[in-house]
Amino acid sequence: MRYEEFLESFLASDKSLKETIKKVSGLEGKMQKDSVKGDIKSLLKNLDALKNAVSSLEEALTGVEESVSSFDYRTYFTSGEFTEDMLLGLKERKMDTVGEYPVFEVFPTRIRIDGENQEVILGKKKVPTMRPKILVDSAADLVDKLESAPFNAQAFAQDLENAYLICVLQEKAKNTGKVNDHLFYVPLLSCYKVMVPLSRSRKEYDEMAFAFDLARLYNEIKKGDFVTKSGHTCLFGTGRGKSVRILDDTGMEQLISTICFR
């Protein structure tokens, strides 16, 4: 059973429960008024009606319980149906999604599905839901929040250039005379490791966060005339080292692996 099918069934049984509770509450109110007015005949009549309503309440509650127990949420997770519904929802929202179970990249964040414990982690936080629609909505809200956050392209470019220069010096030390100072490309992930040397710091600023900052810098450079505070231009390259996947300002995937400042 898919979650939306379960939800439809549950809401129908819950509606019956809600209506019965409303009836019970109404009869109790009438009985209170009857007692105040001294209308014992009406009080006894409403008391009998309340007994019947309470019996109906038990039946309605049983219906809700049966509806909930009919949904095997563990199987829903482990069978892959939850993942299928989530991916369909992301596609309908036109959200860029790559990866395979249990980890999916929804740039610039990730969704991890823990089938064993029936849990979902969006970014770095657990999302207490088993309804794919709510997860997709939460992912969309997080992406919007990240994309609307302020970004200082100059400050990031300067940090990146500083790391780049350290990598160039390290390369020179290993390969004396073989480094072209004018046009030398350094793997982006080498720069990342220089920028974030401690493993515990990489938990706070991981490669995904780095890729997102690269994407925003990439888009800033696309506008033209971007130079660093030191007066250098920034060039991205491909083909050397592990690629970093980013999305440009049109939503197109770009794979970049190296960088050069000149």
Language-model-derived ranges and their functions:
Residues 1-150:
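Long, compositionally biased intrinsically disordered regions
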Residues 71-84, 88-93, 97-104, 172-186, ...:
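Short glycine-rich, low-complexity/disordered patches
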Residues 73-77, 193-204:
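Short helix-coil junctions and helix-kink-helix linkers
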Residues 131-132, 152, 187, 206:
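Alpha-helix initiation/capping motif
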Residues 138-141, 155, 159, 209:
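Exposed alpha-helical structural elements
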Residues 150-200:
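Positively charged, polyanion-binding regions of nucleic-acid-associated proteins
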Residues 202-221:
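Short amphipathic alpha-helical interaction segments
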Residues 216-262:
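C-terminal engagement modules used by replication, chromatin/transcription, nuclear envelope/ESCRT
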